[in-house]
UniProtKB/Swiss-Prot annotation:
Transmembrane regions: 298-315
Function, in words: Syntaxin required for targeting and fusion of Golgi-derived retrograde transport vesicles with the ER.
Lumenal-side segments: 316-319
Topology class, membrane: Single-pass type IV membrane protein
Localization annotation: Endoplasmic reticulum membrane
Highest taxon in the source lineage: Eukaryota
Quaternary state and interactors: Component of a SNARE complex consisting of ufe1, use1, sec20 and sec22 or ykt6. Interacts with sad1.
Entry GO MF terms: SNAP receptor activity
Keywords of this entry: Coiled coil, Endoplasmic reticulum, ER-Golgi transport, Membrane, Protein transport, Transmembrane, Transmembrane helix, Transport
Protein name (Swiss-Prot/TrEMBL): Syntaxin ufe1
Entry GO terms, CC: endoplasmic reticulum; endoplasmic reticulum membrane; SNARE complex
Residues annotated as domain t-SNARE coiled-coil homology: 228-290
Annotated organism of origin: Schizosaccharomyces pombe (strain 972 / ATCC 24843) (Fission yeast)
Residue stretches in coiled coil: none
Length: 319
């Protein structure tokens, strides 16, 4: 087949079409499966882009927030807007929770699509020998191609979702490690700081009234309560972060298991397609052999009848 690429480019030049100004059209699928798959794909891509844009603000060492200055949701902000963003610990936890919920929702939707593929696969008749392939090969091929395509779509969606969960897990892990490093540095500074004349001296509780007034003691108690609350809040955040990391690990395990199942299903479909091809090839060979046998029989009968005709003519002349 000759290449007509140059002819195509010539036609586009003659048409004076500016490809850059052609408006993009949203893909419209008549197949509900593909429409749902495209919607899940769009959600996953938006999550991945958001995590990459929010990475800088998420990992900043800040304890205050300026999110209220934004006029639109975080998902719709540009990279420049998010780079100037300041987040507190609560908002970081909210981002993790929202992304984890979106990942779980995508997993649930993909599971529904898997049930559709299983139902489609169950409708394909079992093959037993080459005669089964000769009954209606075009119809069987269409069904199997559709199932194989849908399985490939599921595999691709699960692969994308695995990438998103890996990015989120990496961000959470970095946040946890940095928090642990800061606490270790502060602890080392307090324990290794050499004692001097300004170092704190432990005062017996019975002598506190001598060194401090009642108001000073109340202020110290209040400061101590605040420090305890901050410590408890930090420990609670650590527990929540650990729980979130465990949830992400669980999600990754589920996605990996589903990817393995989809890979096995794709390999099975590929083997089935090869078996169909072998069956069709065997059927074609049988047809060729049958055709060859029938042609040989016809030639043999033609020769026999020709010889008999000649004999009859000869006998007629003799008589």
């Amino acid at each position: 087949m000759t290449s007509r690429t140059n002819e195509f480019f010539g036609l586009t030049k003659n048409g004076d079409i500016d490809a850059a100004n052609i408006p993009l059209k949203r893909i419209s699928y008549t197949d509900p499966f593909l429409a749902e798959g495209y919607r899940i794909h769009e959600t996953i891509v938006n999550l991945l882009v958001f995590l990459k844009k929010i990475r800088g603000a998420y990992l900043k060492d800040r304890t205050f927030s300026n999110v209220q200055r934004l006029s639109k949701p975080l998902m719709e902000c540009s990279l420049e807007e998010l780079s100037k963003l300041e987040l507190d610990e609560v908002q970081r936890d909210e981002i993790e929770h929202e992304v984890s919920s979106a990942i779980s929702s995508c997993i649930h939707q993909i599971a529904k699509l898997q049930e559709i593929v299983k139902e489609q696969q169950s409708q394909i008749p079992k093959k037993s020998g080459w005669l089964q392939g000769l009954r209606d090969p075009s119809k069987l091929s269409k069904k199997e191609t559709l199932v194989a395509h849908h399985s490939s779509v599921l595999w691709y969606l699960q692969s994308e979702l695995s990438d998103v969960s890996s990015v989120l897990y990496h961000l959470q892990d970095l946040r946890l490690k940095r928090g642990q490093e800061k606490r270790n540095i502060a602890s080392d500074f307090l324990t290794k700081n050499p004692t001097d004349e300004n170092s704190a001296v432990e005062i017996p509780e019975s002598e506190l009234q001598t060194f401090f007034t009642q108001q000073q003691l109340q202020e110290l108690e209040q400061e101590n309560d605040v420090l305890l609350q901050e410590f408890e809040h930090t420990m609670e955040r650590l527990r929540d972060t650990g729980k979130s990391l465990a949830d992400i690990t669980r999600l990754q395990s589920e996605i990996s298991a589903q990817l393995s199942i989809q890979s096995s299903a794709a390999e099975k479909l590929y083997d089935d397609a090869l078996n169909v091809m072998d069956s069709l090839s065997g059927g074609n060979q049988q047809l060729i052999k049958a055709k060859s046998r029938s042609s040989r029989t016809a030639r043999l009968l033609f020769c026999i009848f020709t010889v008999m005709g000649l004999l009859l003519l000869s006998l007629d002349r003799i008589v």
